[in-house]
Regions:
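PLP-dependent class I/II
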Residues: 1-135
Length: 135
């Protein structure tokens, strides 16, 4: 086997010894860490759901089945997609994925990544809450 390969963009890629060792260590000794991360992310899902119900009831959350990405149903806000993007980016200062990126069914939705410290998530939701209040 060659010590290098070509990437999709035509660039030469070199496999690094530490990458192999890291993967081996993760598979051999990563169960406890993974369990903790999964538990923390589940806590962030619950936190987001509660926060939205209590503070931004016009935005509903679609509970993820096996992900740290949450779709926010913002259709009750009555905004078109351009206005919705402006609300998130310019008013709330948040960079989420536009739901229409995933097809026309995503109109009125935004996708939120909750794989972050809870304090960061809480701050983001507070910024969103303030932006919605100011509509």
């Amino acid at each position: 086997m060659l010590p290098y390969r070509f990437g999709n963009d035509g660039e030469v890629r070199e496999e690094h010894l530490f990458a192999y060792l890291s993967v081996a260590a993760a598979y051999s000794h990563g169960t406890e860490w993974l369990d903790q991360v999964v538990g923390y992310i589940k806590g962030n899902v619950d936190f987001t759901e509660t926060y939205l119900k209590e503070h931004i009831p016009a935005i509903k959350m679609i509970r993820p089945q096996a992900s740290y990405l949450i779709f926010l149903d913002c259709r009750e806000l009555g905004l078109n997609q351009k206005e919705l993007n402006r609300l998130f980016v310019e008013d709330a200062h948040l960079a989420l994925n536009d739901g229409t990126t995933f097809g026309k069914e995503g109109k009125g939705f935004m996708r939120l990544n909750i794989a972050c410290p809870r304090a960061v998530l809480e701050q983001a939701l507070k910024q969103l809450e303030q932006a919605v209040v100011n509509l």
